[in-house]
């Protein structure tokens, strides 16, 4: 009875992790966190004017789409901080001249 190595599921798990990360980032970025204006039958999420016999709503519209988007202030943006820290870690790890090698073939 020959010994066989267990199946390698690392590629499947890597693809699943990347897919879940993409889905989570899209859901986070596209989520609407602005307050709703209007009542249950008249919503004005993008601004506008509604006039009824007894009711008038004037809403100028949102200034940003969600809580993650705000102006062009890069140091405050979460995605910019992630990219900046990743680049710093990569550059610092490449600059070190010595590599750790255990000396065994794997």
From Swiss-Prot:
Pfam families reported in the protein's UniProt record: Plant_vir_prot
Localization, UniProt: Host endoplasmic reticulum membrane
This protein's GO CC annotations: host cell endoplasmic reticulum membrane; membrane
Other observations noted: TGBp1, TGBp2 and TGBp3 seem to act together for cell-to-cell propagation. TGBp1 is the main movement protein that physically cross the plasmodesma with the viral genome. TGBp2 and TGBp3 would facilitate TGBp1 function.
Role summary: Plays a role in viral cell-to-cell propagation, by facilitating genome transport to neighboring plant cells through plasmosdesmata,.
Family: Belongs to the Tymovirales TGBp2 protein family.
Protein name as catalogued: Movement protein TGB2
Provenance organism: Chrysanthemum virus B (CVB)
Lineage, uppermost ranks: Viruses, Riboviria, Orthornavirae, Kitrinoviricota, Alsuviricetes
